[in-house]
Amino acid sequence: MTDIPIDRIRNFSIIAHIDHGKSTLADRLIQLTGALSDREMTNQVLDNMELERERGITIKAQTVRLTYRAKDGLVYALNLMDTPGHVDFAYEVSRSLAACEGSLLVVDASQGVEAQTLANVYQAIDANHEIVPVLNKVDLPAAEPDRVKKQIEDVIGLDASDALMISAKTGLGVDTVLEALVTRLPAPKGNANGELKALLVDSWYDAYLGVIILVRVKDGVLRRGQKIRMMSTGATYTVDQVGVFSPRMTPVETLNPGEMGYINAAIKTVADTNVGDTITDDRVPAAEPLAGFKPSIPVVWCGLYPIDADDFEKLRDSLGKLRLNDASFHFEAETSAALGFGFRCGFLGLLHLEIIQERLSREFDLDLIATAPSVVYKLHKTNGEHLELHNPADMPDGSVIEKIEEPWIKATIMVPDDYLGAILTLCSERRGQQVDLTYVGNRAMAVYRLPLNEVVFDFYDRLKSVSRGYASFDYQMDGYEESDLVRISILVNAEAVDALSFIAHRSAAENRGRQICAKLKELIPRQLFKIAIQAAIGSRIIARETLGALSKDVTAKCYGGDISRKRKLLEKQKEGKKRMRQFGKVEIPQSAFLAALKMDN
């Protein structure tokens, strides 16, 4: 299986927006090359996580090796790297692109170019990829291939005159894709006699084999029994197994330059394998590591707490297991007066947060409370100290803060021009600054700078609802800027509830505070005494709601008689309530927490 020379190897990835048919095209390529029999085929073969199939998205990058006999009679090895399309998994995309020389750009012929397609194409262009445009779903009545070709040329600047016309669902034209891979993509370069250099593309944990590493060999040969070294940590291991995915794991003797495959070397934890690291031979190490890719930095943080306090250790183990398969996910232990012991977790974005939460509840059967997502702020104190703030509850008093900087993003929004007005209004409500606005046919492309804090709550949902689902959105980080930000504390019966505090711009603080107080008033059960629910900035109260007391009719047992008897009982009740208000503790039920934290901002 490994005797295919390097000039007949093609490494490629598929770039597409969500739902443009990327995983379906991968299925057809696997079927046409006979990698799996018809009996073994399932839809979305490479999306092997139940969650991926259910949501129709690709989360983890997957690889598969296909052998294809081309029209010139020669057998080629095609290594397909299936990449995610969603903005939160851009890190997975950058890894996949670093391992390939070319890309198929799949665009839905009825919908045209979307924002996430753009972001990934620019990454591929930066990685010097040869890009082959493919128009999918040309069999649909709504398909407009000529308009979409023009759009590819105008928006991306790629020549689309020889774009391939296919329907991945029916299999129409998929054979032309295989031929194009052979004729239009370059072969990898590499020297089999040089020092071993292999790029660590991904790693995941297998319960039986330990850590499995996905590699792309650049130079040298990787073989079973070899002693290898990780160049970033200096750790050494002996290779137990070398193989390729076709798409099942298939052991081979060696991996040669230009090939992609996996190795298993009895590594205990994925923390020992840094994605983007260079693997070399321990006896004859390479002098220089390969250019890796940028490590991922979490941009959204939130607290995760078990509803049942006994599940804390189980949550720690579960987070550790997810971290094994997801290098971009961070967590550290923290405690909250209201919620007990839990973890502060860092994510690449909101979809990433949602996926991790869902995996915790499905795969590990955990019931969790998540605090409101927040971003990382940079604090400059008056004594010259600089802090990074992940948790709003840790924000110091305003008197010692010189300035606060918040992260901004540069967002690209593609939308049919009928909905442009609503989108522009939404962006300006969220303190957006317009950078660019261009028209391509009947679609507009708006580029905005927005504070990330305004995007993490419900911006994506609002964007979809004001554009009836037609807008697509993509962003990249765009530095930090000083801003007038305040911490809003929520007080229940004059006690601060740390889990509900949040940071907002001063202009929106009062409104947000009022909303959360009103929501809590509905959710907290009434007590025997009055409860004040307040929102405060420092010591200044900006919003208040009062939850009325339950009243017990203490005079019910008095039939007739003197009024002073009734008055005495009422006075006694009043005294008791006053004392209760002073010493009474208000238990906020978990359902109230969940609802308040889920509240649309």
UniProtKB/Swiss-Prot annotation:
Its EC number is 3.6.5.n1. GO terms for cellular component: plasma membrane. It is an enzyme of class 3 (hydrolase). PROSITE patterns: G_TR_1 (PS00301), G_TR_2 (PS51722). GO terms for biological process: positive regulation of translation. GTP binds at D19, H20, G21, K22, S23, T24, N136, K137, V138, D139. Signal peptide: none annotated. It is found in: Cell inner membrane. It holds the Pfam family GTP_EFTU. The keyword Hydrolase applies. It comes from the Bacteria. Transmembrane segments: none annotated. Keywords: Cell inner membrane, Cell membrane, GTP-binding, Hydrolase, Membrane, Nucleotide-binding, Protein biosynthesis. InterPro entries: EF-4, EFG_III/V, EFG_V-like, EFTu-like_2, G_TR_CS, LepA_C_sf, LepA_CTD, LepA_IV. It catalyses: GTP + H2O = GDP + phosphate + H(+). Residues 7-189 form the tr-type G domain. The keyword Cell membrane applies. One of its GO terms (molecular function) is GTPase activity. It is a peripheral membrane protein. Required for accurate and efficient protein synthesis under certain stress conditions. May act as a fidelity factor of the translation reaction, by catalyzing a one-codon backward translocation of tRNAs on improperly translocated ribosomes. Back-translocation proceeds from a post-translocation (POST) complex to a pre-translocation (PRE) complex, thus giving elongation factor G a second chance to translocate the tRNAs correctly. Binds to ribosomes in a GTP-dependent manner. Belongs to the TRAFAC class translation factor GTPase superfamily. Classic translation factor GTPase family. LepA subfamily. This is Elongation factor 4. It comes from Granulibacter bethesdensis (strain ATCC BAA-1260 / CGDNIH1).
